[in-house]
Amino acid sequence: THAFDRTHVTGEKIIVRNAKIDEKLELLDGENIELTHEDLVICDIEGPIALAGIRGGKKDSILDDTIDVVLEVANFTAGAIRNTGKRFDEKTDASIRYEKGIDTQRVDQGLALGIKLFKEIFPEAEFTAFKDVNPVETKRAEVDVTKAFLDTRLGKVLDDNEISDTLGRLGFDVEFKNGVFHTVAPTWRSTGDISMRDDVLGEIARLV
């Protein structure tokens, strides 16, 4: 989540794109960086105003006299943020979160929290417009794991229903057929957290 001073944003919208060759950006601390085509940036119609998921730019930064704000709540590809962060030796609270992968459904929650905080600090604040651009849902991770594998690794035999119920409490959808559990992880565990049968095993082991 990042806030921009609307009066300094040129044009009617902000854009997320890869930087153009030889484009530059002045960061909040005054440092000027030279961008490459691999860097993801937030732009107005004039050019970059923030290094996506890492640092804000100085041009549209929030000042003491700011009264008109654009609130950007977004999600970015983990690899893109990681590569840009390494290139500029930048590691921020935001970039650390993005590098780990974020459930895209958390974007709505982030927006709601941002609005709530604005209203708490500035009760007179009015929200005049909203736009959802290029929404992409997090694909839920699907993993098949056999009952025999679980019994062997857990060191004890659990009832089929107990396994299904345990995973269900963690937000998984589970179907058991012919000795195989077909598990579908919740979105908030599908950004790299759950990807193989050992991950499913670990979820069960910590609760039984």
PLM feature segments, named:
Residues 1-208:
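RNA/tRNA-interacting regions in translation and RNA-turnover enzymes
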